[in-house]
């Protein structure tokens, strides 16, 4: 045996106290603060009624602690951080605490007296006085517990005072009316309560983290022990308390609530911590002793391996088996430390008897022997034995019991450990270190609060809160992360688009009970979530974002996702949460799920409160004179549904009152809406008022989505003929230099374009996915007995709070069902009557839309940059308009001259004898050079030049009609296919862009013919516009039964002009077409035609482009559909076509027109037989 005393086995409790070495402060009182914190936690998680809670808070804290105890309470953090509070600040804090204690004693006595005789006016007045005194004292005192420089030493008493303040504010929220306070005062104090919950919570978390981060992270076990003690003791005295603060919200929690703490704390190292030079590093201990975030688990057993070194048996390693909440599946930990067999492995397991199936206490036996620098020996710092104690004080031994007691750090309440224990052993970790001649094996005990049980039990008479870390399964993409400090434990983080987690629930009710469900969450974007419990579901519900992207988690980051559809269930069930609108894999945080039992009365009261809150939120103030700007017409309808669904049995009077208020809100909404006929009583009812639209739009009555009429816009097969709906806001309704907003509700849509047009167009394309019927199959019929939609039946909800976020001109993949688009108005001019055009348009075959509750309202006056921007836009528009007026004058003059030249006189009822189709087309092209006859966004809406455009366009239509009347050939333009034509062999009629058709004769054996009745002895002109591709000839022949035959021939390159008056070659012919001075009547007509269409008789070799139509490119900028106005069936002939004609004098009353070819392809655009004028 070694003789040196320092090399002997030295019991742990014989060593100099480690804390004496660290801070020079005795340890004897260190558990007083823990007792106070744990006592308050026990009270907070209890189910006692509110009156008993008030008295209990006095008995446990404010009536039980005197100045000396408060002094010890302050010593706690001083000891841990090595900072003493100045004497003056300490005495001031203790005096304030004692003063609050004295006031609260008077307050609780007054409350007890009032409870005995609650209608006594004197006692009610006394309660009002005592509340006001208590509230004022706390409002004054709490800032003194946050003195600059002492925030961390005073943090525990700050939280105690804050807890008292919130408790008192909850009292007045619950009892205030019975004490005689008016409703306005109660609401004001309730607002104080909800505001201070956040302020007190965030303050405590901020300074807890600051204090923890200031602690040094060195000195091995000794430094880690101090760090861990700060973390554990302030978790108990600060974080545990503030995690309950949300429960003081009396309107959120109107009945007793079961609360659970799932966080873990770690007791001090049970080995010697004085010689930090030979122990593991701080980082090594922190990494090996502290568990990573995980689902909450419960201890099954510990299998301990024992090793032997220099005659000392010690705890060398172990494994832990456990199970998740409500799960029988065994979870095995990795091996901690080493595997050893100096003795058989010991399995440490608690009893399986309910209530005894845990360890609440450990008694550890450490061994320490310091190495000798002179005579080398092995330093040993290990644990030789531990006694694990059950609540009945039954003991399971690992080798032997020691004297290091975990109750010194986690004390019980009173003497009865069966009901007074505060924590249960949940896990054990181990840190092992070999350093030079020193060995350290450090088991660390992990504890969870007694409030978190191994079953998720939901009771039918209280609100049950279940932290979501008590799930038994997480899907891929979901994990557990460190809690932000105020949630009572860790939380769930997920980025999945689908199922998130599964948990086991045990409903204590044996018959079906209805519960409302809500989930506390934080999200940087809107989310759609549902909860399934067995066969019952809340259905999908949309919830708004609560925080900015990448923002830190504070108390304000979390909100409740409260589902309007409850569940009905009983017994044991498996529950799941799923998220369904997260294709971008955004991250959400989930804290806990809550179950609120409801009966008919509770549900009626809940619905009434919800309806009252919804109605009151419509108005800017309590006098209900003005609506809030952001309150939409659709929202008013939904609030009306809430009111309509209130129970006549429980709240008939309140329902009538709320109904009048919401009707008033609807009238105010109608008054501020500048749209005419916003409820769609009709479309195209009045020429100059209300809605104008395409004939395929349908108006439908209210349904499960809309309370009033809505419109359905179908898709279209031609983008030049879109489905459209529009209305003009008259200039007289607009105010100068104001911003206006168009908004409404879209049930679903695809490729819906929305425009607001004034100086320019504001444009969005919105795609809003629908979900089919709003009514799930599992609910009762949504149809009332008279066929009306039953809007009181729970139904699916989407994303009700997210505003449309697309920028101007973007095509959004997914929008909110609520849309809005704004436009700025500059100076108003009633003479110009510019107004604002509201346009909805669909120009795709796949497009569709169902929308209603449309509004156009005044949003706000323009100031600053917005005012400057609209003035610049207005000036730019006026400058552009002045240039347009000059250009229009020139173009109009040219176009009118060309149009007038088509007719004999100003009566416009007879064409000139030499007017041909090319001349009409040329004149029409000039007419279409008049810009802004119609809006480019929708060529049905008149622009500033519509009058002069339609004047000339009507005359062009007259000319075409007169010209068509002269053509005795039916369907000569093939726009009706082969109607009226006789066909032999195979031919095609190919429809070109913009409704133009051509005849294609692809084979030499094919023939197309038509028999025509004529007047014998009269003269006719046969005119053909065609194109020959490839070799051979294309022929159009006219003949009678016998003889009198003539024909027009077309070649790819003419060697000789076929006109009787012209014998030039192909090149001569092409050159001749450009001779403006030609006197030949046939050629003069062709000159005009070719000038109009820039004809080129040299054909392209490529077949397809030769008869594929070109488009006007000079009409309304980028809108190629604008020229459809009034001129649909006559299009410009593409380059490459040739027009030829001949004179024919029939001798009988019947002639035949025959079309054929000898080789290649023959493409015919038009065949005309015109009667010559006498």
Curated annotation (Swiss-Prot):
<dbReference type="Pfam" id="PF18449">
    <property type="entry name" value="Endotoxin_C2"/>
</dbReference>
<dbReference type="Pfam" id="PF17997">
    <property type="entry name" value="Cry1Ac_D5"/>
</dbReference>
<comment type="function">
    <text>Promotes colloidosmotic lysis by binding to the midgut epithelial cells of many lepidopteran larvae.</text>
</comment>
<comment type="similarity">
    <text>Belongs to the delta endotoxin family.</text>
</comment>
<dbReference type="InterPro" id="IPR008979">
    <property type="entry name" value="Galactose-bd-like_sf"/>
</dbReference>
<keyword id="KW-0843">Virulence</keyword>
<dbReference type="GO" id="GO:0005102">
    <property type="term" value="F:signaling receptor binding"/>
</dbReference>
<protein>
    <recommendedName>
        <fullName>Pesticidal crystal protein Cry1Eb</fullName>
    </recommendedName>
</protein>
<dbReference type="Pfam" id="PF00555">
    <property type="entry name" value="Endotoxin_M"/>
</dbReference>
<keyword id="KW-0749">Sporulation</keyword>
<dbReference type="InterPro" id="IPR036399">
    <property type="entry name" value="Pest_cryst_cen_dom_sf"/>
</dbReference>
<dbReference type="InterPro" id="IPR048645">
    <property type="entry name" value="Cry1Ac-like_dom-VII"/>
</dbReference>
<dbReference type="Pfam" id="PF03944">
    <property type="entry name" value="Endotoxin_C"/>
</dbReference>
<dbReference type="InterPro" id="IPR005638">
    <property type="entry name" value="Pest_crys_dom-III"/>
</dbReference>
<dbReference type="InterPro" id="IPR041587">
    <property type="entry name" value="Cry_V"/>
</dbReference>
<keyword id="KW-0800">Toxin</keyword>
<dbReference type="InterPro" id="IPR036716">
    <property type="entry name" value="Pest_crys_N_sf"/>
</dbReference>
<dbReference type="InterPro" id="IPR054544">
    <property type="entry name" value="Pest_crys_Cry1Aa_dom-IV"/>
</dbReference>
<dbReference type="InterPro" id="IPR005639">
    <property type="entry name" value="Pest_crys_dom_I"/>
</dbReference>
<dbReference type="Pfam" id="PF21463">
    <property type="entry name" value="Cry1Ac_dom-VII"/>
</dbReference>
<dbReference type="InterPro" id="IPR001178">
    <property type="entry name" value="Pest_cryst_dom_II"/>
</dbReference>
<dbReference type="GO" id="GO:0001907">
    <property type="term" value="P:symbiont-mediated killing of host cell"/>
</dbReference>
<dbReference type="GO" id="GO:0030435">
    <property type="term" value="P:sporulation resulting in formation of a cellular spore"/>
</dbReference>
<dbReference type="Pfam" id="PF03945">
    <property type="entry name" value="Endotoxin_N"/>
</dbReference>
<dbReference type="GO" id="GO:0090729">
    <property type="term" value="F:toxin activity"/>
</dbReference>
<dbReference type="InterPro" id="IPR038979">
    <property type="entry name" value="Pest_crys"/>
</dbReference>
């Amino acid at each position: 045996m070694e003789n040196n005393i320092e090399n002997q086995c030295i019991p742990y409790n014989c060593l100099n106290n480690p804390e004496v070495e660290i801070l020079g402060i005795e340890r004897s009182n260190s558990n007083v603060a823990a007792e106070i914190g744990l006592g308050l936690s026990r009270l907070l998680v209890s189910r006692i009624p509110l009156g008993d809670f008030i008295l209990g808070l006095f008995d446990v804290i404010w009536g039980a602690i005197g100045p000396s105890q408060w002094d010890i309470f302050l010593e706690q953090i001083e000891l841990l951080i090595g900072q003493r509070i100045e004497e003056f600040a300490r005495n001031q804090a203790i005096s304030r605490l004692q003063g609050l204690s004295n006031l609260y004693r008077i307050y609780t006595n007054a409350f007890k007296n009032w409870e005995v005789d609650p209608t006594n006016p004197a006692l009610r007045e006394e309660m009002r006085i005592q509340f006001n005194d208590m509230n004022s004292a706390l409002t004054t005192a709490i800032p003194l517990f946050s003195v600059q420089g002492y925030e961390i030493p005073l943090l525990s008493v700050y939280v105690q005072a804050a807890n008292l303040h919130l408790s008192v504010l909850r009292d007045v929220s619950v009892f205030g009316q019975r004490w005689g306070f008016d409703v306005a005062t109660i609401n004001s104090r309730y607002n104080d309560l909800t505001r201070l919950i956040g302020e007190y919570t965030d303050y405590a978390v901020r300074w807890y983290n600051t204090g923890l981060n200031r602690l040094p992270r060195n000195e091995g076990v000794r430094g880690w022990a101090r760090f861990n003690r700060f973390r554990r003791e302030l978790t108990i005295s600060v974080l545990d308390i503030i995690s309950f603060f949300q429960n003081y919200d009396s309107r959120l929690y109107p009945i007793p609530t079961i609360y659970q703490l799932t966080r873990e704390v770690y007791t001090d190292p049970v080995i010697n911590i004085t010689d930090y030079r030979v122990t593991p590093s701080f980082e090594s201990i922190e990494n090996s002793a502290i568990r990573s975030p995980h689902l909450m688990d419960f201890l099954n057993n510990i299998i301990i391996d024992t090793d032997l070194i220099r005659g000392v048996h010690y705890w060398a390693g172990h494994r832990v088996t456990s199970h998740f909440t409500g799960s029988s599946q065994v979870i095995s930990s990795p091996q901690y430390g080493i595997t050893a067999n100096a003795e058989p492995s010991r399995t440490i397991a608690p009893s399986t008897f309910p209530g005894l199936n845990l360890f609440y206490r450990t008694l550890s036996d450490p061994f320490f022997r310091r190495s000798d620098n002179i005579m080398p020996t092995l330093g040993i710092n290990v644990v030789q034995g531990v006694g694990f104690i059950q609540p009945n004080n039954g003991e399971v031994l690992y080798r032997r019991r020691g004297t290091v007691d975990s109750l010194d750090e986690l004390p019980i309440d009173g003497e009865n450990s069966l009901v007074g224990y505060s924590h249960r052993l949940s896990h054990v970790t181990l840190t092992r270190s070999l350093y030079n001649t020193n060995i350290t094996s450090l088991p660390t005990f992990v504890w969870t609060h007694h409030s978190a049980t191994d079953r998720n039990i939901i009771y039918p008479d209280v609100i049950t809160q279940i932290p979501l870390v008590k799930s038994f399964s997480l899907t891929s993409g979901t994990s557990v992360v460190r809690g932000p400090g105020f949630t009572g434990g860790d939380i769930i983080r997920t980025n999945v688009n689908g199922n998130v987690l599964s948990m086991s629930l045990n409903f204590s009710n044996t018959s079906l009970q209805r519960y409302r469900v809500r989930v506390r969450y934080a999200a940087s974007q809107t989310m759609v979530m549902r909860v399934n419990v067995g066969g019952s579901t809340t259905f999908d519900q949309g919830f708004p974002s609560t925080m900015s992207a990448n923002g830190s988690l504070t108390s304000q980051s979390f909100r409740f996702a409260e589902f309007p559809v409850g569940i009905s269930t009983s017994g044991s069930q498996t529950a799941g949460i799923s998220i369904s609108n997260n294709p971008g894999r955004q991250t959400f945080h989930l804290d806990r799920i809550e179950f609120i039992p409801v009966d008919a009365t509770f549900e009626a009261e809940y619905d009434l409160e919800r309806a009252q809150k919804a109605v009151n939120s419509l108005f800017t103030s309590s006098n209900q004179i003005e609506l809030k700007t952001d309150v939409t017409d659709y929202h008013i309808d939904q609030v009306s549904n809430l009111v309509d669904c209130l129970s006549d049995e429980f709240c008939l009077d309140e329902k009538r009152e709320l109904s009048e208020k919401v009707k008033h809100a609807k009238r105010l909404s109608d008054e501020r809406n500048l749209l005419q006929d916003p409820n769609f009583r009709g479309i195209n009812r009045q020429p100059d008022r209300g809605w104008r639209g395409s004939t395929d739009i349908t108006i439908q009555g209210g349904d499960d989505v809309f309370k009033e009429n809505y419109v359905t816009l179908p898709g279209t097969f031609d983008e030049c003929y879109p489905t459209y709906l529009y209305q003009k806001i008259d200039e007289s309704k607009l105010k100068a230099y104001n911003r206006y907003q168009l908004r409404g509700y879209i049930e679903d849509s695809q490729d819906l374009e929305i425009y607001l047009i004034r100086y320019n167009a504001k444009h969005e394309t919105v795609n809003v996915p629908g979900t089919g019927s709003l009514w799930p199959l599992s609910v009762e019929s949504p149809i009332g007995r008279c066929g009306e939609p039953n809007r009181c039946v729970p139904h699916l909800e989407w994303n009700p709070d997210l505003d449309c976020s697309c920028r101007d001109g973007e095509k959004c993949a997914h929008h909110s069902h609520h849309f809005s688009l704004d436009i700025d108005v500059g100076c108003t001019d009633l003479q110009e009557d510019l107004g604002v055009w509201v346009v909805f348009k669909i120009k795709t075959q796949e497009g569709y839309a169902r929308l209603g509750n449309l509004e156009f309202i005044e949003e706000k006056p323009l100031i600053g940059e917005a005012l400057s921007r609209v003035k610049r836009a207005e000036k730019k528009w006026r400058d552009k308009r002045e240039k347009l007026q000059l250009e229009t004058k020139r173009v109009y003059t040219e176009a009118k001259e060309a149009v007038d030249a088509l007719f004999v006189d100003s009566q416009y009822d007879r064409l000139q004898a030499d007017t041909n189709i090319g001349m009409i087309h040329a004149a029409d092209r000039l007419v279409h050079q008049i810009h802004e006859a119609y809006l480019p966004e929708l060529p049905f809406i008149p622009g500033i030049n519509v009058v002069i455009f339609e004047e000339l366009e009507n005359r062009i239509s007259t000319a075409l009609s007169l010209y068509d009347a002269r053509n005795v050939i039916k369907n000569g333009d093939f726009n009706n296919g082969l109607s009226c034509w006789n066909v032999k062999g195979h031919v095609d009629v190919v429809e070109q862009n913009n409704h133009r058709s051509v005849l294609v004769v692809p084979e030499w054996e094919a023939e197309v013919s038509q028999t025509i009745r004529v007047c014998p002895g009269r003269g006719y002109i046969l005119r053909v516009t065609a194109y020959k591709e490839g070799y051979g000839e294309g022929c159009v022949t006219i003949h009678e039964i016998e003889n009198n035959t003539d024909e027009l021939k077309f070649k790819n390159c003419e060697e000789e002009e076929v006109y009787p008056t012209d014998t030039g070659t192909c090149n001569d012919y092409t050159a001749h077409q450009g001779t403006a001075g030609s006197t030949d009547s046939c050629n003069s007509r062709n000159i005009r035609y070719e000038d109009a269409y820039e004809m080129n008789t040299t054909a392209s070799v490529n077949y397809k482009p030769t008869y594929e139509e070109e488009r006007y490119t000079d009409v309304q900028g980028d809108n190629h559909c604008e020229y459809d106005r009034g001129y649909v069936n006559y299009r410009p002939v593409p380059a490459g076509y040739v027009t030829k004609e001949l004179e024919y004098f029939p001798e009988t009353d019947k002639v035949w027109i025959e079309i054929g070819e000898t080789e290649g392809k023959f493409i015919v655009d038009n065949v005309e037989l015109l009667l010559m004028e006498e």
